[in-house]
Every structure is written in C-alpha cells, then in structure tokens.
C-alpha cells in the first residue's frame, strides 16, 4: 500500500531561554508526493472531471506506485468515459512519453468503447508509445485487459495493487469483498493469468515464493487488516462484507497469517 513521508524543519531564535518560550513551529509545507496522495485519497468523495484529470496527469509506469495508479486511473476513465476526450485534454502530459504510456495502458484496462478508441489513437499517432507498449494497431488486445479481472479475485501481486487502486477510486464493496475472498482462499490458482505489461524480470522475481505459501492471498489479507486497524470506517466496511459471507470464510479470515520465511534459501521458484 501507499505511504507518505513528512519532513519538518524548524529554526528558533530567542532573547533568553528564561524570558521567551520557543515560538510554535510553522506548519510544514506538504511535499509533492503528499499533495498527490491527498488528491488520490479525496477523489472517491469528489469524483469530478477536474480531479480525475489532475490524477491522470500525475502518474507514470515508472512510479513506485505505478501499478496502484493504473488501477485507480482505469476506474476514473470508466467513470468519465462519456467525457473522455475532455478528460485526456485536461490531463495533459503531451510532452511526457511516460504519462502517455500510462494513459494508454489505463485506457486498455478500462475497456470501454471510448477508452479503446482513445488507446488506438495514441498508438496510431505515437510511434514511441507503440514501441514501448509492444502493441501494434490492429492486433488483438492483450488477454488481461479488463478491470473485472483485476478485481474479481486478484491472482498476482501487481493485480492486487491495481485492484486496490480501483477500490480507492470508488470504495466499491464488491472489490473489498474480492480482497477477503482472495485472503481466505484455500489454494492458489493453478495457472494464474499474467499481466501483459509485466516484464520478464519482474515476473521472475514475483515467481519466487516459499513452498506452500500463497503470497498474494497473504498480501490481500494483511493489507486489508492493516488498513482496518488504522481506519475505523474502513474496519466497519470490512465487517459489513464479512457478515454476508459463509461461516467458513469468516473463520479463515479470523485465523492468524502463516509465518513467512525470511531466509531466501527457503524460497523455491514456482513452476511457470
């Protein structure tokens, strides 16, 4: 999940320590990352076209939260699909290949008639993006392109990140329920579908997992429970979702997470 770093600098000057107490510290300026995060956090309550455009213009695939933001932005593209041309114009980023690639990817994932047309247009007139994205106009779309497949039950770590982005953009209870299903499943998928934008190097790293451990399931459960501890309103949403689920799911949710080996020698690459 996401986090923020707060930096505070203070310089005090007084006549004497006995005569004058230190003045209150001036409020620190928010960092750019914190301002971006505040915009993301407040979007679900104010899903306006203007806020959507600001968020869409923020992110790139090179960002450390890039996959989270892809899920987030794919959802807001869906919300404003009727006004997509205006949204993309407001988002800007014409001089940034990274942002154009990010927008193109999000349009594919959103999978609406308007967003598919926008993605095809970007690819047709932007040879740099065509080369980066490894998609050529007129070829079939990648197999893994729809938000429903990201959010129905995340099967890869990057899909889980994207699903969290889609949830934070909408606060949809069905997505939260999918995290609970993922966190309580009794077996990992035999052949999880792969995200087309994941590089071979990223996939090789993600394939390393301890024997018998469904790391995505663990991550889903840990991330929900961690947020619930810090956010009472979110905790209430979790309980509302759990109350609709079978007793065995509720019991597995209450069970402690298994120990996760810390020694890399205990990791065994999963078969492709």
Task: Locate the predicted segments by residue.
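Bacterial N-terminal signal peptides
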Residues: 4-14
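Non-catalytic all-alpha helical scaffold/repeat segments
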Residues: 19-272
